[in-house]
Design a protein with these regions (language model features):
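Class I S-adenosyl-L-methionine-dependent methyltransferase catalytic core
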Residues: 1-217
């Protein structure tokens, strides 16, 4: 079987290293209700996507330690696909963390999309592989919800990093990362220090407070 370009690039990046905790936010493809691949809005040039088969073919199992944790972001409409990816990567689903997107006043941010309901949440699936793969002691009291404001399209909250690093052991790998992060190996076409969003979506709060301070300095 010929590996897709993303799988080849990932294998080259990992180069035999092993990680005990992996965080992934794949660029999922969506199908609309007619079964066709739903394109991004024409006014928003965001990012390319990968097919389900391409995501499943990434050799994540070879990058994971014998005992490891996986945190996998998945849209509400693609939960079955997320579970299939988790299994293809060699992990068993155990639990999840819900991200509730809120407004500045703390209420639910109703600008999400959805055919059946207006989505104000995303799900971070948690899976394990190997023996004795329970979370670290802080995980035993960590609630499985994050309530934060959304940033630019698809970007996940920075609050996930201290949560993950307190509940799971290193070394840490982030796949499809945006920007650099101390203490993490990062892979993806936006994984560099100069990353900043190239579209105006939610521009009024697309930066973290720290980034806003730097931008205004």
């Amino acid at each position: 079987m010929t590996l897709a370009p993303a799988a080849v690039d990932f294998s080259s990046f990992v180069a035999g290293r092993k990680f005990k905790t992996i965080l992934a936010d794949p660029p999922w493809q969506f199908q609309n209700r007619t079964g066709k691949i739903a394109p991004e809005h024409k006014r928003l040039n965001r990012y390319g996507t990968l097919s389900l088969d391409d995501i499943k073919s990434l050799p994540v199992a070879s990058a994971a330690d014998d005992t490891a944790h996986l945190y996998l972001w998945v849209p509400n409409a693609l939960l079955p696909e997320g579970l299939a990816v988790m299994a293809a990567w060699g992990f068993k689903y155990k639990s999840n963390i819900v991200w509730q997107k809120i407004r500045k006043d703390g209420g639910p941010d109703g600008r999400g999309v959805g055919f059946y309901f207006r989505n104000v949440t995303e799900v971070l699936l948690f899976g394990t592989r190997g023996k004795n793969a329970r979370t670290l002691q802080p995980g035993r009291t960590q609630v499985n919800i994050m309530c934060t404001r959304k940033r630019e399209h698809s970007r996940k909250p920075d609050e996930q990093y201290p949560l993950i690093s307190s509940c799971s052991p290193g070394p840490f790998l982030e796949m499809f990362a945006r920007g650099k992060r101390d203490g993490w190996a990062i892979w993806g076409n936006q994984a560099d220090e100069s990353y900043s969003p190239s579209w105006a979506t939610y521009s009024n709060h697309s930066q973290s407070p720290a980034e806003l301070q730097l931008a205004l300095a």
